[in-house]
C-alpha cells in the first residue's frame, strides 16, 4: 500500500478546516516551497502562530505583507562585501513564502527574536455567521382558537 504525505499542503492554509484528514498524504514537495523552515501552531480555536526560522537575517531584510487572503513573507540578504567561507551551512538565499488565509483570518502582528520570525493570526467570525440558539415557543391548548365548528 502506498502512502502519500500531504502535510506540506496543510502548512500553507491557515484557518481552513481539514476536509481531507482521511487522506493524510500526498506528494512531498522539496526545495523552494519548504524554505525557510516553518511551524504553524494552533494556539486556540481562533488563534494561530506561524514561526519561521530565519537565522542570519535581520528584521530590515524581511517583508511581511497581508493582501486579501494571502500572507506573504519575503527576505533578501543585503550585500555586505565578499566573504570567503570554508563551509557555509547557514543559508542566506532570497526567499518568498506564501500562506493562504481563510476568510475572516487577520494578521494581528509579527515579531522577530533570535532569528525566529513569529506572526500572530486571529480568526474573527462575524456575529451573523456564528451559530445561535433559536427558542421554541410552546402554545398551550387553551391558547388555540377554534375557527370552524363541527356540523351537527
From Swiss-Prot:
Pfam families: HSP20. InterPro entries: A-crystallin/Hsp20_dom, ACD_IbpA/B, HSP20-like_chaperone. Residues 29-139 form the sHSP domain. Keywords: Stress response. PROSITE patterns: SHSP. GO terms for cellular component: cytoplasm. Belongs to the small heat shock protein (HSP20) family. This is Small heat shock protein HspA. The lineage of its organism: Bacteria, Pseudomonadati, Pseudomonadota, Alphaproteobacteria, Hyphomicrobiales. The gene is hspA.
Amino acid at each position: 500500500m502506498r502512502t502519500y504525505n500531504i502535510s506540506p499542503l496543510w502548512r500553507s492554509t491557515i484557518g481552513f478546516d481539514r476536509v481531507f484528514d482521511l487522506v493524510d498524504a500526498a506528494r512531498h514537495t522539496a526545495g523552494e516551497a519548504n524554505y525557510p523552515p516553518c511551524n504553524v501552531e494552533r494556539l486556540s480555536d481562533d488563534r494561530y502562530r506561524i514561526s519561521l526560522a530565519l537565522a542570519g537575517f535581520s528584521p530590515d531584510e524581511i517583508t511581511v505583507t497581508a493582501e486579501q487572503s494571502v500572507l506573504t513573507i519575503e527576505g533578501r540578504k543585503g550585500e555586505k562585501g565578499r566573504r570567503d567561507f570554508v563551509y557555509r551551512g547557514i543559508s542566506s538565499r532570497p526567499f518568498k513564502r506564501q500562506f493562504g488565509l481563510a476568510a475572516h483570518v487577520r494578521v494581528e502582528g509579527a515579531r522577530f527574536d533570535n532569528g525566529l520570525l513569529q506572526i500572530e493570526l486571529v480568526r474573527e467570525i462575524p456575529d451573523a455567521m456564528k451559530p445561535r440558539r433559536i427558542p421554541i415557543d410552546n402554545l398551550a391548548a387553551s391558547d388555540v382558537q377554534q375557527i370552524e365548528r363541527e356540523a351537527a
